[in-house]
From Swiss-Prot:
This is Endothelin receptor type B. A lipid is attached at C402, C403, C405 (S-palmitoyl cysteine). CDD domains: 7tmA_ET-BR. Residues 127-137, 198-218, 297-324, 390-442 are cytoplasmic. The chain crosses the membrane at residues 102-126, 138-163, 176-197, 219-243, 272-296, 325-350, 363-389. GO terms for molecular function: endothelin receptor activity.
Amino acid sequence: MQPPPSLCGRALVALVLACGLSRIWGEERGFPPDRATPLLQTAEIMTPPTKTLWPKGSNASLARSLAPAEVPKGDRTAGSPPRTISPPPCEGSIEIKETFKYINTVVSCLVFVLGIIGNSTLLRIIYKNKCMRNGPNILIASLALGDLLHIIIDIPITVYKLLAEDWPFGVEMCKLVPFIQKASVGITVLSLCALSIDRYRAVASWSRIKGIGVPKWTAVEIVLIWVVSVVLAVPEAVGFDMITIDYKGRYLRICLLHPTQKTAFMQFYKTAKDWWLFSFYFCLPLAITAFFYTLMTCEMLRKKSGMQIALNDHLKQRREVAKTVFCLVLVFALCWLPLHLSRILKLTIYDQNDPNRCELLSFLLVLDYIGINMASLNSCINPIALYLVSKRFKNCFKSCLCCWCQSFEEKQSLEEKQSCLKFKANDHGYDNFRSSNKYSSS
């Protein structure tokens, strides 16, 4: 008769059997194997699966709202872990995505061509024509340069991402693309604010003659605009990352604002991002423009009765520049309003647990796609607005586009030469007028 096995031997056999059974049970339940890179199921970041394929620039909060809803405490037994239920997916979102995929592609290609031609021509006009080198035009050139960077780098990658669905460009480009996009928008916003303030200073300070050349304060403004825009875009580069998801039986790499942020600041930024974008990148330029243009109008009405004939031409030129700046701000507001409106409506009135939410979600998706296209148009529409509003820019555009390969100074129109001479004569007449007033008052 053999001795019974020891207690340690029995425990060892039981442990081996338990490990084997747990491994088999885990494989049957479909648990993913360990891997070097994190793999998230679609339900962990967004549901339904159609949300994984939204183009860059769409509402990030639409993805956040699609997390599985938690079962109320009263509906689960005591001591049991919280369970989640997913609301039924909205089938209409797939049709909306397929419809706008090609619309976005056509609009992006149009913006790419018009934006490169228009902004490059605008920069060449200001660089070649000495009569156009002044404070407001240098700010407009800074705005055009920011739009040009966004068009060259962001738009081609965005179109590829929209059509190919997978992100093959790596983590570096995943962080660089949203960084450049936000920096470009920041340059646009701060440049419009600086232009509005500059127009008020030009009207309020009649002794401040607009001459040829870049004032030192304008150069400082441009440096500050670019530095602040780059700093404010850093959270985008920090927060965006690549995530691998399981989508319809295949693994897709997507680039988005990561659902889990490491630092408290980035968690706060992810939560308050939509409100921050709406307040700073949309409401701020409109509020500053409305404030300073109201002051400028009051100043012009107050001094209108004391205007002299010698100032008429000089005043007309300043009014034309003020009208041009106002049109740029108006175009900016119209282009960005749909996108910000969809984000705010999503944050305020959308309920992910509402069984009748699909109609509202379809409306918000359509508004979101329209907003993306309108925001892209803002990168190419500023040169067109300048061509339609300003006579001087219109003449320069015609001359520059007709003789792109030749020297602009040799082929500039006679009207521009006369405008420069007339501008200098007006400044000289204004100086004489101020001197005569000074001696007469003495």
